[in-house]
Amino acid sequence: MKKIYLIAFSVLLLASCGKYNKALKSDDVDKKFTLAKEYYEIGIQEEKKSKLNKAIRLLEQIQPALKGKPQDEVVSYMIANAYYTIGDHFISGYRFDRYAKSFPDSPKIEEALYKSANSYFEVSPKYSLDQEDTHKAIDKLQFYVNAFEDGEFFKKANEQLAVLRDKLERKDYEVAKQLHHRRIWRPAIHALGNFIENHPGSKYNENAYFYKFESQYIYAVNSFRAIERERLEKAVEYYNDFVSKYPDSEFMEQAELHKKEIDDELYYLELLDL
């Protein structure tokens, strides 16, 4: 009995493959579309990549012949959604974006805009890498939430925007922090200052304020005597900024030690009349 089932399955499989291969070689657009639609619907319902890949290949074969025809909209959507469902988000992002631009009055426009944005969200890399796709995702998600305030994906899109913005924020912070940790003081001061200015409500700002102060302090005490006072006074300014904003900071003990050393150095410079 088991052999019978295996034989029957093999026959069906061969018949299915034969039908697909025959369609690939055919010039009959309607036949290709009918079979592609069958594969597509099964693939979507059962999340079968093999069926969707077959649908994609057939649909991409016939799409050029459908340009300017009503069926082009249907085929364009099916291709984009098939790529989206199999998780090929680089292509689905591009495909849905092109669909939205080509068919702005489509009843599926909201879905297309969100799925394009979500595709870029899915390919957004970790914070330490190039963030081009992150910026694209933010632009597209923001466009979606502006256009569809009552949209089906509005809440999720806003949550995704928060995730992506936090990623960019962390990247900016890590770049500035690394300058401090690598003891490149002057660029660190500049980068940390920019970070604070660009991200006024950041969860990293306590660290950023302290590292900015510490960078200025070390930069100052390693300066020539003629310019040390001015740089120390700037360090005092950054110290005051830090302690006024974070009086209970975990860095307070270290900050106070630096401040005492600054005061001692300023007193010494006063004695030298510099």
Where are these regions (language model features)?
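Sec-dependent signal peptide recognition
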Residues: 2-8
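Acidic, polar-rich low-complexity tracts and alpha-helical solenoid repeat scaffolds
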Residues: 5, 16-274
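Hydrophobic core
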Residues: 12-14
